[in-house]
Amino acid sequence: MRRIAVFDAPSNLGLRPPTATSVPGCAKGPGALRDRGLVERLSARDAGCLTPPRYDPGDWRPGDGVAQASAISLYSVRLADRIEETIDEGEFPLVLGGDCSIIIGAGLAMRRRAQASDERIGLVYVDGHSDFRHQGNASYVGAAAGEGLAIVTGRGQPDLAAIEGRRPYFRDADVVLIGIRTHDGYRMDLEAAGIQALPVPKLRAEGAGRSVQWVRAQLAGCSGYWLHVDVDVLDPAVMPAVDAPDPGGIAYPELELLIGGLVSSPGCLGMQVTVFDPDYDLDGAHAGALTESLLAGLHPLLVSGHPPASATAATPAARRTSDPPITTPQPAVGTV
């Protein structure tokens, strides 16, 4: 079995400022998870941190294209290099973000590998939002984190969507989206593109186990796939510490079953976790719950002979089930 190699990609370049005098806090996400012992309890190799460029949206205005595109592009190349190096060492890269724009670097890495082997590599996109805004369906683009799926499927400005001339990083037919809400504004665009999507109600109706089987069937023609997990796929009642919380999400046990079923396949080449924002988690409770959930979901990857450092590594901590569901949409402060 492959050993997990954890490295941080704490880029917040793909989000707009939450206020006029602050920067997105998701750059602190990897540190919060490390503080909860994630790396040690996975018996993973600590592969360090890939430091992003400075966050500086400057005087960006609607119509200027994607904000901080040059910095995101440069960082994506470095991230792709790091992901490829990790896979080439026979390890499973677990990338701790950071915002969803890190999918550009992961996508570039997968496209390089696919072209080198003349094979197809897919993308499993577990996310509360489709991230499918692009110039063809919106009046303007701006925050790359809200456009990540569009960019990696070739819809976007060349400095992001065609790095090294490799547009697209994933074919539409090789992408499966899980966890979007029924009211997602780009569902019709996904359908028109032929991108398969499994909204939360359908996921619930099928169950996580059957949903994983369905995902694998959709990607049967691919030699492997990359797994993207945006923690805003969770309902805000259990995970409000994100830039754009949206009611109607899944629960932790469902997330654990999805991750476990997807990473247990030898075809899963790596995984990224995005958008957890400790600025909205003042007492650290959500960092703790997320860590426990990731440990449980990643348990199939624990290497024989390297047991988890804690007996609780594969067992989620008890969570409150009495919290009332959040029914009022929260403001999407980061990805607009």
Descriptions of predicted regions:
Residues R2-L94, I103-A106, R113, G185, ...:
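Catalytic cores of soluble, metal-dependent hydrolases
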Residues F7, G98, V126-G128, I178, ...:
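Active-site flanking residues adjacent to catalytic metal/cofactor-binding acidic residues
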Residues D88-A162, S265:
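Active-site histidine-anchored catalytic micro-motif
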Residues R120-G122, A173, Y225, C268-L269:
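Residue-level recognition of the N-termini of beta-strands and the immediately preceding loop/turn
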Residues Y125-G128, T153, L177-T182, P199-P201, ...:
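Short, structured patches in soluble enzyme cores that scaffold and shape functional sites
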Residues V141, R166-P168, R187:
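Short secondary-structure boundary/capping segments
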Residues R155, A161-R181:
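Phosphate/diphosphate-binding glycine-rich loops and adjacent basic-rich segments that engage nucleotide
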